[in-house]
């Protein structure tokens, strides 16, 4: 598929300009409108239910195994004694992650000449988190819901996909930065082992795969091995749609620096939420220990067999925290509080917001 040529490297994409007009607007918009609802079909729901059952079993297994090596009474006391003030601060910090995510979209849309207010984008971000958790698809389902929401707010389909591409690439860059930084810290602390090195290597391959497939499709179309890679990723329809997205936004160093910085802030806010959860229970490890443990746990959840990360995240988080000197009971209590703030709590508004977006458009 061909990409519209951009006449200026610095001029924003205007709705009426040739550069911003897709060559196949109707096809592009129709494809996008049908991709997101399709993710809510019966097959997807059955697959999601299977993922949830496996994830919950793994989650309970992790708790039982951890409690076998620790004290159930001590962990229960830590959770019961959690100070609400610290949890409220943690909730406020966690809310900043949604604002940062919305700013990523806002900056990309502003650069493309289709600005939207932040108050419109923040609810979309919450709906995305909920959709990604309920319909595990490596972030694709939630992203397509946001794209559909942007199109419903009169953002051209091509521009919405371009903004999504910026968000995806900036997220991958930021994720690679924090994982490699965490691995470096563990290396200097003499805590790296073969399993961690293998995990980091797999993560790098997986993280680079989707952007490589997208950019490869734009450059070489359906030639092998790009066609094979897109089929292996299981998101061929989305990748085909992405080939119509302008890449000029990705060639803006300023925009990339801004969006990568915002994505890095999200990781920092998430790790800070975990650190504040430890403050709530009264056992506070060093901030670097919390950050490294959170990032490695997120990495393992990303490359693990369960898309929602239930069980794999908790096991790795507790394991890393224990490896770095935190008691097993405190590690599990802090991790469970974090999951409550970042995983379970957003589902409450997420259900309503996601349904509203689907019914609205």
Residue ranges and their predicted role:
Residues 119-123, 138-143, 151-169, 326-337:
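Membrane-interface alpha-helices at helix entry/exit sites of multi-pass transporters
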Residues 2-126, 185, 190-302, 333, ...:
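Predominantly cytoplasmic-facing regulatory/coupling regions of multi-pass membrane proteins
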Residues 127-137, 294-314:
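Transmembrane alpha-helix interface/packing and boundary motifs in multi-pass membrane proteins
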Residues 139-151, 181, 305-323, 352:
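Re-entrant/interfacial helical elements at transmembrane boundaries that shape
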Residues 129-140, 168-180, 211:
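Mid-bilayer segments of alpha-helical transmembrane spans in multi-pass integral membrane proteins
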Residues 134, 145-149, 161-169, 174-176, ...:
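Hydrophobic alpha-helical membrane segments of integral membrane proteins
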Residues 112-113, 151-155, 281-282, 322-326:
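Short helix-loop-helix connector
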């Amino acid at each position: 598929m061909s990409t519209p040529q951009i006449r200026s490297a610095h001029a924003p994409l205007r709705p009426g300009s040739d550069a911003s007009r897709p060559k196949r607007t109707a096809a592009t918009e129709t494809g996008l409108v049908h991709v997101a609802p399709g993710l809510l079909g019966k097959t997807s729901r059955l697959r999601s239910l299977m993922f949830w059952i496996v994830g919950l079993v793994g989650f309970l297994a992790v708790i039982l195994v951890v409690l076998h090596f620790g004290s159930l009474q001590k962990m229960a006391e830590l959770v019961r004694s959690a100070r609400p003030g610290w949890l409220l601060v943690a909730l406020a910090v966690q809310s900043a992650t949604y604002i940062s995510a919305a700013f990523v979209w806002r900056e990309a849309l502003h650069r493309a000449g289709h600005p939207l207010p932040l108050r419109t984008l923040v609810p979309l971000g919450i709906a995305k988190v909920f959709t990604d958790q309920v319909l595990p698809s490596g972030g694709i389902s939630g992203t397509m819901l946001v794209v559909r929401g942007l199109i419903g707010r009169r953002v051209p389909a091509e521009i919405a996909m371009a903004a999504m591409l910026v968000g995806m690439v900036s997220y991958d860059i930021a994720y690679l930065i924090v994982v490699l930084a965490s691995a470096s810290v563990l290396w200097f602390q003499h805590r790296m082992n073969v399993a961690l090195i293998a995990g980091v290597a797999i993560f790098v391959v997986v993280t680079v795969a989707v952007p490589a497939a997208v950019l490869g499709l734009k450059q070489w179309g359906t030639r092998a091995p790009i066609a094979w890679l897109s089929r292996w990723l299981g998101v061929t329809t989305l990748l085909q749609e992405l080939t119509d997205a302008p890449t000029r936004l990705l060639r803006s160093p300023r925009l990339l620096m801004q969006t990568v910085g915002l994505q890095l802030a999200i990781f920092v806010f998430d790790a800070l939420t975990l650190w504040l959860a430890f403050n709530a229970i009264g056992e506070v490890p060093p901030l670097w220990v919390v950050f490294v443990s959170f990032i490695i746990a997120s990495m393992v959840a990303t490359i693990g067999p369960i898309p929602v990360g239930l069980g794999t995240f908790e096991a790795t988080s507790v394991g890393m925290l224990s490896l770095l000197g935190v008691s097993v009971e405190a590690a599990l209590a802090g991790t469970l509080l974090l999951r409550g703030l970042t995983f379970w709590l957003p589902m409450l508004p997420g259900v309503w917001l996601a349904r509203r977006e689907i019914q609205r458009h």
